[in-house]
């Protein structure tokens, strides 16, 4: 069928999976599905990072699930952990490597320096594109836009903050030089592009940002290589937790979507 509105309002359709991407008409269709009592599963980070608050409110009003595990860090179940397992945890900070393209590039540059070679950003980006880790136009990844959208979603889920992608400070990796990688290496650090969401202990304000950072070589995030992602959660009771795995790709994303479909179906069956 070409009638998407007919699908999301069809009484014989129990659950809707949105996979069309973008903001419109995805937003309109999800709202319509929720209003007709249907749970929705999506992997649309652009949508959630810009109009997520509206969609979460609509899901609450309808009493239906809006699940989006695949929108952040692919196959890593960080959304479920924040929403369920850590629901009672006073979280203080979430930080992580949430873009596989930039982590692949930085890993290769670091390896080149460690091996006594030259860490060339342009050549490494070309290699990432050849291997399929980077898009032909890599701007969204290498300038931090993609990680910024994911950080906005994390802020909303972890802290209940109404953060949109445009609010997130972002700085990418395109200006990182071989000498900076080498200096970090000599000092016992590695350079990683981090998404950081944290609550100020005194004011309660939430800050959300994406930028390259020098990570101590002994920190768990320093060992995250190539296109893998990792999210580090810090809380008052649990201290520190790290979630690690493939953050992108068809199979991890499909696994996350299918997991949400199963959860939504179980919840729908149980009323």
PLM feature spans:
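A structured beta-alpha segment of the ubiquitous adenosine-cofactor-binding alpha/beta core
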Residues: 1-15, 19-25
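Conserved active-site and cofactor/substrate-binding residues in soluble primary-metabolism enzymes
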Residues: 2, 11, 50, 73, ...
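Generic hydrophobic/aromatic pocket-lining and core-packing "Φ" positions
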Residues: 4, 27-34, 56, 125, ...
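Rossmann-fold NAD(P)-binding glycine/threonine-rich loop
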Residues: 20-36, 43-84
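Rossmann-like NAD(P)H-binding beta-loop-alpha module
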Residues: 60-134, 138-146, 153
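Substrate-binding/catalytic subdomain of NAD(P)-dependent oxidoreductase enzymes
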Residues: 108, 122-230
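ATP-dependent carboxylate/acyl-activation modules
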Residues: 218-271
């Amino acid at each position: 069928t070409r009638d998407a509105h007919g699908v999301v309002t069809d009484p014989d359709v129990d659950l809707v999976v949105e996979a069309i991407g973008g903001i419109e008409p995805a937003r309109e269709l999800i709202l319509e599905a929720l209003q007709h009592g249907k749970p929705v599963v999506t992997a649309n980070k652009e949508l959630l990072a810009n109009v997520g608050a509206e969609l979460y409110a609509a899901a609450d009003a309808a009493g239906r699930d809006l699940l989006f595990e695949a929108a952040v860090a692919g196959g890593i179940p960080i959304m479920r952990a924040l929403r369920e397992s850590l629901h009672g945890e006073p979280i203080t900070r979430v930080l992580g490597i949430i873009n596989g393209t930039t982590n692949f590039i930085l890993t290769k540059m670091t390896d080149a320096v460690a091996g006594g070679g030259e860490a060339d950003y342009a050549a490494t980006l070309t290699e990432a594109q050849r291997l399929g880790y980077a898009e032909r136009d890599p701007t969204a990844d290498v300038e931090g836009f993609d990680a910024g959208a994911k950080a906005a979603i994390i802020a909303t889920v972890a802290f209940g903050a109404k953060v949109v992608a445009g609010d997130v400070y972002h700085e990418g990796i395109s200006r990182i030089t071989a000498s900076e990688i080498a200096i970090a290496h000599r000092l016992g650090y590695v350079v990683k592009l981090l998404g950081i969401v944290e609550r100020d202990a005194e004011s309660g304000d939430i800050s959300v940002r994406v930028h390259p950072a020098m990570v101590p070589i002994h920190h768990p995030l320093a060992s995250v290589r190539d296109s893998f992602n990792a999210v580090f959660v810090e809380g008052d009771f649990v201290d520190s937790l790290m979630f690690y795995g493939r953050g992108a790709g068809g199979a991890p994303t499909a696994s996350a979507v299918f997991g949400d479909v199963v959860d939504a179906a179980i919840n729908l069956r149980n009323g």
